[in-house]
Regions:
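Short, charged low-complexity linear segments at domain edges
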Residues: 1-22
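Glycine-rich, aromatic-bearing surface loops/beta-hairpins
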Residues: 115-162
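N-terminal interaction modules that seed assembly of large macromolecular complexes
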Residues: 16-58
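Ordered hydrophobic segments in well-structured contexts
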Residues: 32, 77-88, 124, 141-150
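Short flanking/linker segments adjacent to small metal-binding domains or redox-active Cys/His motifs
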Residues: 72-120
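Short Fe-S-cluster ligation motifs
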Residues: 61-76
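A structural detector for beta-sheet-dominated domains
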Residues: 11, 55, 62, 87-89, ...
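Intrinsic-disorder-associated interaction segments
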Residues: 10, 43-47, 79
Length: 162
């Protein structure tokens, strides 16, 4: 299926992606920190456009590959980053992660919002063909979808990131 998402043109296979996600573990099966537990529970409260977007690509948001807290925002939401995988290719577009420096043993990247697709006011994604932590057996070809999202604190416990 060919789709256009802002500057990105993707060829995806949502059914192949969905079939693999059925076998994957939940975020909290791999990490029990407050940030991961909050993200997994907050999925139930995501705006319809965010839920429908992930569903249309075959991705179960509660089973994404990597999620992490960047910081608490002044409005009390948590700025999350992370990524997940989907079956497909990217004939057009470039990642929001832009290299700013390279040394003999490391690279430094910066996130450029101009290279993202906005799903909602608080949720942006970017795509890239260079992938990290691809799950064993994930069908090829594989794309990585990078996430940046401001998500409310929904756990019934104190927010340790404030």
């Amino acid at each position: 299926m060919y789709i256009r998402l802002g500057k990105f043109q993707l060829q995806t296979d949502p059914e192949k992606t969905r079939k693999f996600y059925k076998k994957m573990k939940y975020v909290t099966d791999g990490c029990g920190c407050a940030g991961c537990r909050n993200f997994e529970k907050a999925v139930d409260y995501m705006p319809d456009e965010v839920f429908c977007f992930f569903h249309s690509l075959g991705i179960d948001m509660k089973k994404i590959t990597e999620i992490y807290v960047n910081r608490a925002n002044p409005d009390g939401t948590i700025l999350y980053g992370g990524f997940c995988h989907l079956c497909g290719t990217m004939p057009e577009g470039k990642s929001a992660w832009v290299e700013t420096q390279e040394t003999s043993d490391s690279k430094t990247f910066v996130w450029q919002k101009a290279n993202t697709y906005e799903i909602s006011d608080d949720f942006r994604v970017s795509f890239q063909e260079e992938c990290a932590l691809v799950e064993k057996g994930f069908p090829r070809p594989v794309l990585q979808m990078e996430i940046e999202a401001a998500i409310p604190w929904v756990l019934e416990e104190e927010n340790p990131y404030l």
